[in-house]
């Protein structure tokens, strides 16, 4: 009988472990793709300057031009070539920054120094043919979280655009699942070698990435300092989100940001929420015969609905950038 009990307990333990492993595998992709550090040629150049790893896309026209710091998401490296070149064609100089994952950079999205973004903005402002009074930051997903945090520290920015944004600073992320489980990462971001306040992930059972963020946000009131202080941002803010986002509840968090800004007399916040779009609903639209078109429907919504959101939101993003820089020019002129 004792042997049967031992076998039963052992089997139960194994089943429990399998359930936990399956839940984690569903939440965090164990087969994370190789980090891409895209070749900037022929329209840009690689920057490797005192820890700054980026692709720079200058404007090939006379005069001085606005500049944009461009931030990708939790994929790491530099994979936003299409967006960078699309902005470059609109006469914006673009610095597509890698903040983790590239050679000689951290392999985990943990304790990324905010000073790195300070350095990137200073580098941009110092370049010839760039108007240092016309700077913006644009980020997607985890890069949107970073963009909003950066904006709270840089009142000189004239525009802040965030696709699939977060209203809080989150715990970090390690693509190595075993390490993620055994030694959970610290916060995503640091300042002066210390983590900034962050919202930790729930330790409850979850069924997919969306649920981990939804359950974690339930505890947000217990971590008030993790909320991004949008009220101190000095520029108008544009937020783009998909109601069917399967990664995190970007529209709920976008509305949180707008509500906080309104309650605390912060900047104007515009939310573009797309009912049928998912996490891929922001960015440069793709042609329907593009090799990656079908992937637009892999993280919420259909490929067609996500591309529709891209067509609409990208047009409005360009209008927003143009208007933000023009308003600043009018204020300077007065």
Model-derived features with residue positions:
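N-terminal cap/lid segment of alpha/beta-hydrolase-fold proteins
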Residues: 22-66
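Hydrolase active-site cap/lid region
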Residues: 27, 31, 149-215
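Active-site glycine-rich loops that stabilize anionic/oxyanionic intermediates
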Residues: 65, 72-77, 243
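Short beta-strand/loop motif that positions the catalytic acidic residue
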Residues: 233, 239-241, 245
């Amino acid at each position: 009988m004792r042997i049967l009990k031992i076998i039963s307990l052992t089997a139960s333990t194994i089943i429990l472990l399998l359930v936990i492993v399956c839940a984690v595998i569903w939440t965090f992709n164990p087969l994370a793709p190789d980090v891409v550090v895209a070749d900037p040629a022929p329209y840009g150049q690689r920057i490797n300057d005192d820890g700054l790893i980026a692709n720079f896309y200058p404007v090939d026209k006379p005069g001085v031009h606005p500049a944009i710091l461009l931030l990708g998401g939790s994929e790491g490296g530099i994979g936003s070539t299409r967006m960078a070149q699309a902005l470059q064609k609109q006469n914006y100089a673009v610095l597509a920054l890698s903040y983790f994952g590239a050679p000689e950079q951290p392999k985990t999205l943990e304790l990324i120094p905010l000073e790195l973004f300070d350095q990137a903005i200073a580098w941009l402002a110092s370049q010839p043919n760039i108007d240092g009074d016309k700077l913006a930051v644009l980020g997607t997903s985890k890069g949107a979280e970073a963009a909003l945090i950066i904006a709270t520290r840089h009142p000189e920015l004239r525009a802040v655009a965030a696709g699939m944004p977060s209203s809080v600073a989150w715990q970090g992320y390690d693509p190595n699942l075993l390490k993620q489980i055994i030694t959970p990462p610290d916060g995503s971001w640091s300042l002066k070698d210390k983590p900034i306040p962050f919202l930790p992930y729930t330790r409850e059972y979850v069924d997919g990435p969306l649920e981990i963020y939804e359950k974690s946000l339930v505890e947000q009131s217990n971590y008030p300092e993790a909320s991004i202080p949008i009220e101190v941002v000095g520029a108008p803010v544009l937020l783009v989100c998909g109601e069917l986002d399967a990664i995190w509840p970007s529209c709920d968090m976008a509305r949180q940001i707008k509500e906080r800004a309104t309650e605390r007399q912060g900047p104007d916040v515009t939310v573009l929420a797309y009912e049928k779009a998912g996490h891929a609903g922001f960015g440069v639209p793709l042609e329907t015969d593009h090799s990656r078109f079908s992937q637009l429907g892999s993280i919420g919504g259909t490929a067609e609905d996500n591309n529709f959101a891209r067509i609409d939101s990208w047009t409005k993003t360009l209008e927003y950038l143009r208007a933000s820089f023009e308003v600043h020019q009018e204020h300077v002129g007065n």
